């Protein structure tokens, strides 16, 4: 057993170390929380609303997940930009879940897309057709219109040049255009604004996509998409 004076010294040193370490741990925890909770880096971290700004909802797959934080940054002090805390996947999945994503909140503008999952058939037992895709989109738009928000459809970004890494198939430009034409007709029928992201990048896929087997975008590609989305949202809000 340690002598009394050494035990006292040990306890004092222990308390001093704790008093030094504890604030550091608190600061580290706060810094980590703040980093994780940054809406400009985390797409699923929706901002605390400024009541003086319009509310915007972005609905879409991983392409929109990639550009959402950048859109928030570009529209900072202009709009409260939200999105569902999930990948919104394909059109039939969207039709089933759209009410949950809209929620009970008031939206001034909803910018939405479904497409790539329908083209490639990821996680789907039944292969989509332009007709089934259009039918699902029509159902989605009818539900969105009930919010009385302005609606903007993002025309689906292009397929990758080679066999997609998961589906192992090539989606031709002809197939992509069939689906996009079907979507555009639905939007025309309902008077929905259209943001043509397809034309923005189709001729520069080698530059902006991650690879010939990947539909996703490099940082430069995400910045390009985000700028067009932010500009488009700003224009529609000002109409």
Give a label for each model feature.
Residues 21:
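Extracellular interaction modules
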Residues 49, 74-80, 93-239:
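Alpha-helical cap/lid subdomain in secreted, periplasmic
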């Amino acid at each position: 057993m340690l002598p009394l004076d050494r035990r006292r010294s040990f306890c004092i040193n222990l308390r001093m170390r704790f008093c030094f370490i504890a604030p550091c741990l608190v600061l580290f925890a706060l810094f980590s929380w703040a980093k994780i909770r940054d809406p400009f880096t985390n797409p699923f971290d929706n901002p605390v609303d400024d009541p003086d700004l319009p509310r915007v909802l972005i609905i879409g797959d991983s392409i929109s997940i990639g550009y959402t934080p950048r859109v928030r940054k570009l529209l900072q002090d202009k709009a409260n930009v939200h999105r569902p805390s999930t990948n919104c996947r394909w059109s039939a999945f969207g039709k089933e879940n759209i009410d949950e994503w809209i929620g009970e909140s008031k939206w001034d503008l909803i910018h939405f897309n479904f497409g790539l999952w329908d083209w490639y058939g990821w996680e789907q037992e039944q292969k989509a057709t332009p007709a089934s895709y259009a039918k699902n989109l029509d159902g989605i738009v009818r539900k969105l219109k009930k919010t009385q928000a302005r609606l903007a459809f993002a025309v689906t970004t292009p397929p990758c040049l080679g066999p997609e890494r998961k589906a192992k198939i090539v989606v031709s430009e002809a197939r992509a255009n069939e689906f996009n034409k079907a979507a555009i007709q639905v939007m025309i029928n309902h008077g929905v604004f259209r943001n043509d992201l397809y034309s923005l990048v189709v001729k520069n896929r080698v530059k902006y996509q991650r690879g010939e087997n990947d539909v996703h975008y490099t940082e430069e590609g995400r910045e390009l998409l985000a700028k067009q989305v932010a500009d488009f949202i700003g224009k529609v809000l000002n109409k």
